[in-house]
């Protein structure tokens, strides 16, 4: 064996390999000594031919000038060399050290046109590749050992070169928005584990008829026997939306896919679903029956023969008598149909070559339904306009959901069509979708940060007392039971001192506070106050922090409950009498005076403004309502309907608006003039025709204030305005003079003596006449010329 050594190639780069490979011990004798040289030269010639063709194409596209051909060729070569997908680029682009560390590859939009296939063998962990928006073919990626998902959208792929053994683990293939042909789709059928195939937007007008089955080539030993191989053995999802499929034969091409579960044919030109029925031929060769070798007869609709197997289906597809292009389903109960006959012959058009017998021979079956495992079929955005065009979907045994929204069938109607609802939905349980499903929006979940959580504890705000601070300072004094009553003079002096400290305007701003009026206390509060005066306890509760008992004791009363008030006052007087008996009888007169003052002040402070309620007598005709609800209702009724007697005296302190009665003005209906007859209308027209004068109306001020350039344009109009103004001045002067003469009763003497006499005798009238003469001056010569 020859050991490996260093050698240099034509480009000068060293390479660790054998310059002359070792001879194989199992080499065939037909090969000569220089066989490897011939193979090497042939590969070099093929590479040069490809490079020349690519250079010519790029040269034609870039420029048509002969002088720029060399520049364009250099640019194309540099561009190709710079956009080659290889091992070094993948490691650098994904920041990986070893090829085995890389699991996914994303090179979308990199404008790659070539790739080194040998470098991809080292990427033993790559299972997903996204190479969209490039110019790479499919066969470039066959050297990835464990590749499962491949996306090659927008790559301009037309043909596919795949061999047996390539893409052994590929399960997902996206070839959307390319330019695939029917042959390329057939070549994809040899992928053994392909489950999802996306062929969106490839401009397909039809599908290959042998898409599900491939006929194997006959060997040299057995020329008579034929074998068939299934294509797409593991395909479950097929997306053919956004194409140009219109022929119903596409269903016949796809019906042989035995494991297909989801089929999407959205945004095509499909008009109907054809009836699909398995057909078996008379002879066992697998070929269609023909009457002769004449090629013209092969183009005509062929005669298909139904053989009756052991298990006869309950329906049969027959051509319609009126329209040969359409078919109809005939069930076994149809009159004239007998299952005892050995064979049925019918002529169907070639486009309904439905489920050919080749697929049955591959699985050794005699009869198979169309789409045996299809569960989801989408026909949205097509041209289906009739209900019977969708009914053949009932022959698909595993169909669970049928989508047909945005079709003419449901564009102008509401609800599911009745025939489809009763036959497909109610009987077969197929879910029919006639409206586009709106996907719900994802719920936005805001992450909760523990740092933003409020953990501080805010203490409760204590309740403040209703009595202000300066009143607490005054009332903080020992109870009257512990110290003797002060004299009247001392009380006056204390009040005067307090008034002097606070000033005539009341307490200072720092001690002022909003003090609500205290409510009228009930007899319970009076009793509690009397008991508090009797208590000899030394501990007193401050006014700033009142106890709960004090807060509960301050309850309001209803003003209508006046029956208990006299008893409460009597009870209060009794308590005060008991307190007076306990006091020492040193000054009986002073105690009597203070007692009277206390009763007067207590009544005056508590019931200020409500003294009449203490002495009022109840109305004998008034029925006292029982219960708090009746009292509340009576009070609400009195407040809603108050009996107020307003005084007749006018209030002079307020501004009063005089009463002005409004007059109702009814609009007068205008009286239409009498309708003129046709003779009167003709007379008016003739009168207008006889009078050729054209009257032009224009404001006098605007005509006189125009500029010199505009005056030249309308010179006639300007002269007419000057003449009218001169005439107006003359008439106005004459009118003023005649009116003055009648007022002063003066004889009309000549003009100069009159002016002197008036100016001498009556100075005011003379000045007025001079003013009028100056105002009404005659136009000058320049104005008259103009």
Curated annotation (Swiss-Prot):
Cystine connections: none
Chain segments annotated as coiled-coil in the UniProt record: 714-738
Composition-biased stretches (Basic and acidic residues): 570-583
Protein name: X-ray radiation resistance-associated protein 1
Compositional bias of kind Polar residues: 524-537, 554-569
Entry function: May be involved in the response of cells to X-ray radiation.
Subcellular location: Cytoplasm; Nucleus
Alphabetized PANTHER family for the sequence: X-RAY RADIATION RESISTANCE ASSOCIATED PROTEIN 1 XRRA1, X-RAY RADIATION RESISTANCE-ASSOCIATED PROTEIN 1
GN (gene name): Xrra1
Key words of the record: Coiled coil, Cytoplasm, Leucine-rich repeat, Nucleus, Repeat
Residues in LRR repeats: 146-158, 169-192, 193-214, 234-255, 259-280
Region Disordered: start-end pairs: 474-493, 524-604
GO CC terms of this entry: cytoplasm; nuclear body; nucleus
GO BP terms in the entry: response to X-ray
């Amino acid at each position: 064996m020859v050991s490996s050594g260093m050698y240099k190639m034509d480009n000068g780069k060293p390479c660790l390999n054998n310059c002359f490979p070792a001879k194989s011990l199992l080499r065939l004798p037909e090969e000569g000594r220089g066989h490897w040289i011939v193979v090497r030269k042939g590969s070099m010639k093929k590479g040069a031919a490809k490079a020349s063709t690519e250079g010519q194409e790029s040269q034609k596209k870039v420029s048509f000038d002969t002088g720029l051909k060399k520049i364009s060729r250099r640019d194309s070569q540099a561009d190709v060399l710079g956009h080659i997908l290889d091992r070094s680029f993948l490691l650098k682009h994904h920041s990986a050290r070893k090829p085995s560390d890389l699991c996914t590859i994303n090179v979308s939009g990199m404008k790659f046109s070539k790739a080194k296939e040998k470098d991809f063998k080292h990427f033993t962990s790559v299972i997903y590749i996204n190479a969209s928006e490039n110019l790479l073919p499919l066969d470039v990626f066959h050297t990835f050992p464990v590749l499962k998902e491949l996306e090659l959208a927008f790559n301009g792929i037309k043909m596919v070169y795949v061999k047996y053994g390539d893409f052994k683990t590929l399960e997902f293939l996206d070839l959307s928005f390319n330019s695939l042909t029917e042959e390329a789709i057939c070549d994809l059928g040899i992928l053994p584990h392909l489950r999802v195939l996306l062929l969106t937007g490839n401009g397909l007008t039809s599908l290959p008829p042998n898409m599900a089955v491939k006929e194997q080539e006959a060997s040299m030993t057995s020329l008579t026997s034929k074998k068939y191989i299934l294509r797409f053995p593991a395909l479950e999802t097929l997306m053919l939306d956004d194409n140009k499929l219109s022929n119903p034969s596409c269903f016949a091409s796809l019906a042989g896919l035995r494991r297909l579960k989801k089929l999407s044919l959205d945004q095509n030109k499909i008009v109907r679903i054809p009836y699909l029925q398995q057909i078996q031929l008379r002879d066992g060769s697998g070929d269609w029956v023909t009457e002769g070798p004449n090629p013209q007869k092969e183009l005509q609709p062929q005669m298909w023969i139904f053989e009756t197997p052991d298990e006869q289906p309950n329906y049969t597809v027959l051509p319609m008598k009126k329209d040969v292009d359409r078919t109809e389903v005939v069930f076994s109960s149809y009159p004239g149909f007998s299952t005892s006959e050995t064979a049925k012959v019918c002529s169907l058009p070639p486009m309904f070559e439905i489920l050919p017998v080749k697929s049955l021979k591959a699985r050794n079956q005699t009869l198979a339904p169309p789409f045996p495992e299809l569960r989801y079929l989408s026909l949205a955005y097509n041209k289906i306009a009739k209900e019977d065009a969708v009914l053949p979907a009932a022959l698909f045994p595993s169909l669970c959901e049928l989508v047909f929204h945005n079709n003419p069938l449901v564009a102008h109607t509401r609800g599911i069509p009745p025939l489809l609802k009763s036959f497909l939905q109610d009987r077969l349980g197929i879910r029919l979708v006639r409206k586009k499903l709106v996907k719900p929006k994802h719920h936005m979940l805001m992450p909760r940060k523990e740092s933003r959580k409020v953990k501080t504890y805010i203490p409760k705000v204590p309740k403040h007392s209703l009595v202000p601070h300066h009143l607490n300072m005054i009332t903080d004094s020992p109870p009257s039971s512990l110290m003797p009553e002060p004299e009247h003079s001392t009380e006056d002096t204390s009040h005067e001192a307090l008034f002097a400290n606070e000033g005539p305007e009341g307490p200072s701003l720092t001690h002022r506070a909003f003090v609500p009026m205290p409510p009228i206390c009930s007899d319970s509060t009076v009793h509690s106050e009397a008991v508090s005066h009797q208590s000899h306890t030394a501990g007193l509760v401050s006014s700033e922090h009142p106890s709960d008992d004090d807060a509960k004791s301050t309850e309001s009363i209803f003003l209508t409950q006046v029956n208990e008030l006299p008893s409460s006052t009597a009870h209060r007087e009794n308590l005060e009498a008991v307190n007076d008996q306990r006091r020492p009888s040193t000054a009986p007169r002073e105690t009597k005076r203070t007692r009277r003052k206390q009763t007067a002040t207590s009544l005056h402070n508590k019931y200020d403004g409500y003294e009449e309620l203490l002495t009022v007598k109840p109305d004998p005709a008034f029925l006292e309502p029982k219960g708090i609800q009746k009292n509340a209702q009576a009070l609400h009724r009195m407040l809603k309907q108050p009996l107020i007697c307003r005084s007749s005296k006018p209030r002079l302190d307020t501004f009063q608006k005089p009463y002005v009665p409004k007059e109702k003005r009814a609009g007068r209906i205008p009286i239409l003039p009498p309708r003129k007859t046709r003779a009167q209308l003709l007379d008016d027209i003739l009168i207008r025709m006889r009078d050729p004068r054209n009257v032009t109306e224009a404001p006098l001020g605007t005509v006189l204030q125009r500029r010199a350039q505009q005056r030249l344009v309308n010179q006639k109009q300007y002269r007419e305005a000057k003449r009218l103004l001169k005439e107006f001045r003359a008439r106005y002067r004459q009118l003023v003079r005649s009116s003055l003469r009648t007022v002063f009763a003066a004889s009309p003497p000549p003009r100069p003596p009159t002016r002197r006499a008036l100016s001498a005798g009556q100075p005011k009238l003379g000045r007025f006449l001079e003013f009028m003469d100056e105002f009404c001056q005659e136009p000058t010569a320049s104005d008259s010329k103009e």
